[in-house]
Every structure is written in structure tokens, then in C-alpha cells.
Swiss-Prot record:
NCBIfam families: ATP_syn_A_arch (TIGR01043), PRK04192.1 (NF003220). GO terms for biological process: proton motive force-driven plasma membrane ATP synthesis. Keywords: ATP synthesis, ATP-binding, Cell membrane, Hydrogen ion transport, Ion transport, Membrane, Nucleotide-binding, Translocase, Transport. One of its GO terms (cellular component) is proton-transporting two-sector ATPase complex, catalytic domain. The lineage of its organism: Archaea, Methanobacteriati, Methanobacteriota, Stenosarchaea group, Methanomicrobia. It catalyses: ATP + H2O + 4 H(+)(in) = ADP + phosphate + 5 H(+)(out). ATP binds at G237, P238, F239, G240, S241, G242, K243, T244. This is A-type ATP synthase subunit A. It is found in: Cell membrane. Its main location: membrane. It comes from Methanoregula boonei (strain DSM 21154 / JCM 14090 / 6A8).
């Protein structure tokens, strides 16, 4: 598919006829759908979203206060596109890929209107090393060379929407992103920079079934409800249940090579937290600051609503670009509900027929359009790359039956349900293990067998069984107390408490417990299973539940979470536990 030309073309100017918040109507404007236009005397950036006869309806990505009918509107002739090339990593952009650092230097802490800034620095020079030579045939999307951007190698590619060709000359050395680095035999010239329309998914050779988990270091996610690389997940939850902290934990510790974090309509303080924390935190795989693998898109709640839609598309396009280099990318969108609310506002300004709860009828289509751009793929240059999308959903009052949550659940394959009751009990992450699910378990079964342990999947099923059994017994316990239960079920209640408090609870602010690798998760779960087996054997031998639940070694188990070199202390606890149970059985 040929994408619109990079250069803006001058067209006849239109005139503003009507203004309704972020939606304006122009007349006498020669425009196509999704053209980027400049609105008013201040040249505010907007996008054509509807054409009705001579009326061109535009959503404006900046505040429209003070503009009036009669002001000019000019069409750039381009669709909303992002600049892709060296310099993306460590950047922080607004929803339309204006670097906030550049805007601060231009106008201070408060963004003025009508200011444009390129997404990449056009002055900075990058050292380009070619990987192809003169005479080589290059296909669309082929890797031409490399730039050491941070600790990550940025692969410079031929745009995916051009014809194949033969390299005539290719240069090595220091260049800006605009300088020509390769000339093909048919005379076509290409720099390091590409521009790509955000609404058009970047092409791939084929989509594949995901079979490798995206490891996050969070026990409840990796252990019970894993997401695959190239998978989709939703984190719905009421206010204050920990959506943003969970998203930030995933951005910090997930084993993706690149992280794109979109703050879409959420509080500005949350983006500030990411900006202040990430440069000081070390990436566990590379040992470098986490910021070096991150692209941030800050579109906070006080920014114009129309730009929320742009921020989501900008983020996924940048993620696809890194995927095309053969990297695993994880994209966090916090929160897709704010984007849906922006759609609702724009839709009502357009006087469209509302759907459920006032959301537009095309809500489901837009959400699936976004989530379907995730996936594990074979790229055009025959590499394997993936984009994993994790979207937070903020249902008002924690009502999971509202349209955004329901439509999201229909699309995604992993559901991490945050629970206000758990967060009020200070159980974090507050993910409800009874309501959550992952549809990737079967696909990831073999990976866990080979890379963790052949009995990991059985251990996981056992833990889930114990937690479900506890939920069934909870009603009786609340009515008559746990002492009225049969002895075996008293032990089940105790083992479930251990799984909850030792395995599922995790402290995001503890230097060790914030990230837990799969081996440690397996060893912790195995220790709890050992206690369960020893307890059931002791109970069958006549030992009372009161004695079983008060053994000393068990009380030391929770401390293992906070110990980095845990192998020896854990082996000692298991040995002591065995000895104590032997003593109890002998006494019985």
C-alpha cells in the first residue's frame, strides 16, 4: 500500500463555519478523510474526521478557546504520521509526537497553542554502520544498517511500502536523520528517517501463534495468569485498586526489549513518577537505566481530549516500528477508558446516534482495531518480532459490565481483574485470582515444562485448586468459624492463606521483592506444596490441626520473598519443616 507523500502540498484555504469544543466545521476546503489541517490564525493542528457535502468536520488536537468563525483553515495534504528513526528511545512525547523537552525549551512549562516541533532531532548526528553493500538486492523492510542508539541497536530499514531495488551506494559515518545514506540503482534515495501514518498498521510477512511468555517478575501474573509475547491483556479495576502501579511494574520489569508507555488521559503525577523513577532503575537484563529502552507518550487528563486517540495510535505505530527490527515490544496503555470517553465526547459533538451508555456504535471496532495490531510476527526482513499490548480499563465504580470493559474482554486473551476489596485489605497486587484468567496457558505449557520445571503446570493447577476450595469454604468459616470444619479442610484453609500471603502478595517498593524470577517462584510454590503434603500426612497420622499450623519453620517462609540469595535459607526451612513434622508424627 502506497502511503501519502511526505511533503505537504499547498491547497485552497477553507473558512471556519462552526466551533463546538474540539470539533470544528470548515467550508470551501479541499480535503480527504484523515488529512491533517491547520485551523485558525494560530494554525492549530487538527484532523479531518467527517466530510458532509461542502462541510469538512475536523477534530482539533489543541485547545480551541478563542478561535472564531471566519478564520482560515489550510490543508497540509498529509495524514497524521509519526517520524520513525534514531532518537525515539528515552524520548517523552505528547499525543501527536511533539517532544515535550523541545516544547519546554521553546515556551516554558505550559504548552502554548499552535506550536509544532519535529518528533526526532534533525540536527543530531548518529553513527551509521551499513550491513548491506553495493550490488545487494534489498526488499521492502530490509535492514540497511545499524545505529547504536542507547544500549539498544537501532536497525535502519528500507520503508515497508516501497518497491525492492538494488543498492548502488551506501555510506558509513555520522549523519543526521535527514541525510541520504543509501541510493538505489533506479535513483531512489533514502535517509534514516521514515514517516508512517498512525492509522495504518505496518505490514508484516505473517502472524504467528505466541508460545513464549512475557515474563514480568510479578508472581501472580507469571505464575497463575501469564501473557505471551505478542499477546493482549486488560487490567480493569476501580479507582485506587492499583492499575497504574501494576502498569508501571510491567513497564519496569517485563522482559521485553522495548517498552512504550502511553499515559492516556490519566493524572500528570503518574507520568512524573515514571519520569523520575525510570532513569534510576536498572534493567535486570542489561544493567542499564530502564529509561534507555523506553518511549513515553504523555497525554494527561488536562490535555485536549481529541489528542487521546492520537496518542494511542502514535504509541502502537512506534511499537510496530521496533517490532519490525526484530525486537519484542510491550506497550502499556493507561487508560483505554479515557480514550473511549474522548470518542464519546467527539461522537456527541458530531451528533451521532449514541450506543450503550452514550458511547459511539463503533466503540468495539476501534478497540479491536487497536488490540489487533498486537501479535508475534515474522517481519518483512524474516526476523521474529512481537508487540504485546496491555491496556488498563477504568470502569466507573468498578462496574465490569460497562461497555468499554465488556468490549475489551471480548478482544483480549488475558484478564487481570483488580479488586477494590483486596486493595482495601492491603493485598497487593490486588488481582482477584478467582475472576482473572489467561487463555495462553495451553500455548505456554511446553515453555514452562522446558524452562522452569516439568511439574510447574501441575503445581499451578494445584495452587488454583486450593484457592478455589478456600473460596467455597469461606462462607462456612464466616458463619461458624474454621474450628467447625473437618481437619483436612482446616489444613486447606491454612495452605490457601500461605499461597495468598507468601506467593501472591508482592511488595512493589521492596528492592528484592519487586521482581521475582521464575526459578524463585517455582521454589517458593514447591516449599508451600511441601508443607501441604507434610501437613496432610501428619493429620492422617493423628496430629491435630492446631499443632500442624503452629510449627516454627513455616513462620520463616514469608521472609524468603525479601532475600536475594534465597536458596540456602529456603533449603534450611524445608529441612527444619521436615524434622518438626517427623517429631509430631512420632509423638502422635
Amino acid at each position: 500500500m502506497e502511503v501519502k507523500a511526505n511533503q505537504a502540498k499547498e491547497t485552497k484555504k477553507g473558512v471556519l463555519k462552526r466551533i463546538a469544543g474540539p470539533v470544528v466545521t470548515a467550508v470551501n476546503l479541499d480535503a480527504h478523510m484523515y488529512d491533517v489541517v491547520r485551523v485558525g490564525n494560530e494554525a492549530l493542528m487538527g484532523e479531518v474526521i467527517k466530510i458532509q457535502g461542502d462541510n469538512v468536520i475536523i477534530q482539533v488536537y489543541e485547545d480551541t478557546t478563542g478561535i472564531k468563525p471566519g478564520e482560515p483553515v489550510s490543508n497540509t495534504g498529509l495524514s497524521l504520521a509519526v517520524e520513525l528513526g534514531p532518537g525515539l528511545l528515552t524520548s517523552i512525547y505528547d499525543g501527536i509526537q511533539r517532544p515535550l523537552e523541545v516544547l519546554v525549551n521553546k515556551m516554558g512549562n505550559f504548552i502554548e497553542r499552535g506550536v509544532s516541533a519535529p518528533g526526532l532531532s534533525h540536527e543530531k548526528k548518529w553513527t551509521f554502520k551499513p550491513v548491506v553493500k553495493a550490488g545487494d538486492k534489498v526488499e521492502p523492510g530490509a535492514i540497511l544498517g545499524e545505529v547504536q542508539e542507547t544500549n539498544i541497536v537501532h536497525k535502519v530499514m528500507l520503508p515497508p511500502n516501497v518497491k525492492a531495488g538494488v543498492v548502488k551506494t551506501i555510506k558509513a559515518g555520522d549523519f543526521t536523520v535527514d541525510e541520504i545514506i543509501v541510493i538505489l540503482e533506479d535513483g531512489r534515495e533514502y535517509p534514516m528517517i521514515q514517516r508512517w501514518p498512525v492509522r495504518v498498521p505496518r505490514p508484516v510477512k505473517e502472524k504467528k501463534n505466541p508460545t513464549i511468555p512475557l515474563l514480568t517478575g510479578q508472581r501472580i501474573l507469571d505464575g497463575l495468569f501469564p501473557i505471551a509475547k505478542g499477546g493482549t491483556a486488560a487490567i480493569p479495576g476501580p479507582f485506587g485498586s492499583g492499575k497504574t502501579v501494576t502498569q508501571q511494574q510491567l513497564a519496569k520489569w517485563s522482559d521485553a526489549k522495548i517498552v512504550v508507555y502511553i499515559g492516556c488521559g490519566e493524572r500528570g503525577n503518574e507520568m512524573t513518577e515514571v519520569l523520575t523513577e525510570f532513569p534510576h532503575l536498572e534493567d535486570p537484563t542489561s544493567g542499564k537505566p530502564l529509561m534507555e529502552r523506553t518511549v513515553l507518550i504523555a497525554n494527561t487528563s488536562n490535555m485536549p481530549v481529541a489528542a487521546r486517540e492520537a496518542s494511542v495510535y502514535t504509541g502502537i505505530t512506534i511499537a510496530e516500528y521496533f517490532r519490525d527490527m526484530g525486537y519484542d515490544v510491550s506497550l502499556m496503555a493507561d487508560s483505554t477508558s479515557r480514550w473511549a470517553e474522548a470518542m464519546r465526547e467527539i461522537s456527541s459533538r458530531l451528533e451521532e446516534m449514541p450506543g450503550e451508555e452514550g458511547y459511539p456504535a463503533y466503540l468495539a471496532a476501534r478497540l479491536s482495531e487497536f488490540y489487533e495490531r498486537a501479535g508475534l510476527v515474522e517481519t518483512l526482513n524474516h526476523q521474529s518480532g512481537s508487540v504485546s499490548v496491555i491496556g488498563a480499563v477504568s470502569p466507573p465504580g468498578g462496574d465490569f459490565s460497562e461497555p468499554v470493559t465488556q468490549n475489551t474482554l471480548r478482544i483480549v486473551k488475558v484478564f487481570w481483574a483488580l479488586d477494590a476489596k483486596l486493595s482495601q485489605r492491603r493485598h497487593f497486587p490486588a488481582i482477584n485470582w478467582l475472576n482473572s484468567y489467561s487463555l495462553y496457558l495451553d500455548a505456554l505449557h511446553d515453555w514452562y515444562d522446558k524452562n522452569v520445571s516439568p511439574d510447574w503446570n501441575k503445581l499451578r493447577s494445584w495452587a488454583m485448586g486450593v484457592l478455589q476450595k478456600e473460596a467455597e469454604l469461606q462462607e462456612i468459616v464466616q458463619l461458624v468459624g474454621s474450628d467447625a470444619l473437618p481437619e483436612t479442610e482446616q489444613i486447606t484453609i491454612e495452605v490457601a492463606r500461605m499461597i495468598r500471603e507468601i506467593f501472591l502478595q508482592q511488595n512493589a517498593y521492596d528492592a528484592v521483592d519487586t521482581f521475582c524470577d521464575m526459578q524463585k517462584q517455582y521454589d517458593m510454590m514447591k516449599a508451600i506444596r511441601l508443607y501441604s503434603d507434610l501437613a496432610n500426612t501428619a493429620q492422617a497420622a493423628g496430629v491435630s490441626p492446631a499443632q500442624i499450623t503452629t510449627i516454627k519453620a513455616k513462620n520463616e517462609l514469608p521472609q524468603i520473598k525479601f532475600v536475594k540469595d534465597y536458596k540456602q535459607p529456603l533449603a534450611k526451612i524445608e529441612k527444619d519443616m521436615d524434622a518438626e513434622f517427623n517429631a509430631l508424627r512420632s509423638a502422635a
